[in-house]
Each structure stands twice: as structure tokens, then as C-alpha cells.
């Protein structure tokens, strides 16, 4: 192989390995506890099989999103079509979706989450959809929501 091709493969491999380092919680209770412990807001990604994957490939899989999310938020991915979760957990996820006003998938909701008197509380801050413009633009919109503007 030519050196240029090897260098290109190295950088592409590094990018994909880095994108896989995102730590998504898939259990709502675990994510709420982590938010409460770390005092960080929650990014809830509602998805299902057959929905567009653009937000994942063009936003979540970028180094910019990885850097920002690791420092600023707790990631929770709720796949409403996941056959491996219990019916109780699936029902809990659907109730959360309805309570937050999520009516189409995929959808991202930013929220605060805490535990008071052993009861979890989630307060919706705002919602974000996929928009063309890249991760930096998406992150700046998320920051506006998180600041309450």
C-alpha cells in the first residue's frame, strides 16, 4: 500500500474508533442517577428501527459532539423498538416519550434530571431535531437550550 493510503486509513480508523467511544445509557433510571450524581443535564435520544440515521452519522459520530457531550451532558438513548428490553421498561420509555411531547422519531430532548426523596424528576428544557449544518451548529443550538435562552 502506498503511504498516503495508509495515512488515510489510519485517520479514518481513528475517527470511527473515537465515534464509538460515546457512552449512551439505555436505562432511564441509571441515566437519572448519573445526572443527579454528576449534576449534568440529560440528552435523551428517542429512536426506533427504520427511522433516519442522519443525526447519528452527521452529529453524534463527530469528534466535536464527542468532546462536547463528554464534558457537558449525560447521554440516554431510548430505542422504542428494541426487542431486548423488558415490557416494563418499554412502557416506562413510552410514558416518558408522551410526557415530554415527543411525536416523531428520531427526536432529541434536553432535560434536567434529579432524584429527590427517592423519586426521579425530569424537567424538559427543549427539543432538537436533525438540521443540516453540522455538529457545531447543532451543539450551539443545544447550548442555547441548556442556558435557558
Where are these predicted regions, by residue range?
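Bacterial Sec-dependent N-terminal signal peptides
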Residues: 1-21
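Short active-site neighborhood of thiol/selenol oxidoreductases, capturing the structured segment around
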Residues: 38-52, 108
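Thiol-based oxidoreductase modules, predominantly thioredoxin-like and allied folds used
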Residues: 21-26, 47, 65-91
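A short beta-strand-turn-helix
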Residues: 24-41
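Non-catalytic, surface beta->alpha helical segment in thiol-disulfide oxidoreductase systems
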Residues: 99, 103-149
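Extracellular/periplasmic catalytic domains that process cell-envelope and extracellular macromolecules
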Residues: 36-37, 67-70, 100-104
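Typically the conserved alpha-helix immediately C-terminal to a functionally engaged Cys/Sec
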Residues: 32, 53-70
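Short, solvent-exposed loop/turn and secondary-structure capping segments
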Residues: 54-57, 88, 120-123
Amino acid at each position: 500500500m502506498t503511504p498516503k493510503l495508509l495515512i488515510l486509513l489510519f485517520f479514518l480508523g481513528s475517527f470511527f474508533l473515537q465515534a464509538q467511544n460515546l457512552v449512551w445509557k439505555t436505562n432511564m433510571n441509571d441515566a437519572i442517577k448519573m445526572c443527579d450524581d454528576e449534576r449534568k443535564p440529560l440528552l435523551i435520544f428517542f429512536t426506533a428501527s427504520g427511522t433516519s440515521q442522519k443525526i447519528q452519522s452527521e452529529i453524534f459520530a463527530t469528534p466535536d459532539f464527542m468532546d462536547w457531550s463528554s464534558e457537558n451532558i449525560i447521554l440516554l438513548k431510548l430505542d422504542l423498538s428494541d426487542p431486548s428490553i423488558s415490557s416494563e421498561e418499554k412502557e416506562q420509555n413510552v410514558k416518558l416519550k408522551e410526557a415530554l411531547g415527543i411525536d416523531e422519531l428520531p427526536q432529541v430532548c434536553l432535560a434536567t434530571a434529579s432524584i429527590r426523596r427517592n423519586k426521579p424528576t425530569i424537567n424538559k428544557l427543549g427539543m432538537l431535531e436533525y438540521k443540516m449544518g453540522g455538529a457545531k451548529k447543532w451543539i450551539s443550538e443545544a447550548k442555547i437550550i441548556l442556558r435557558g435562552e
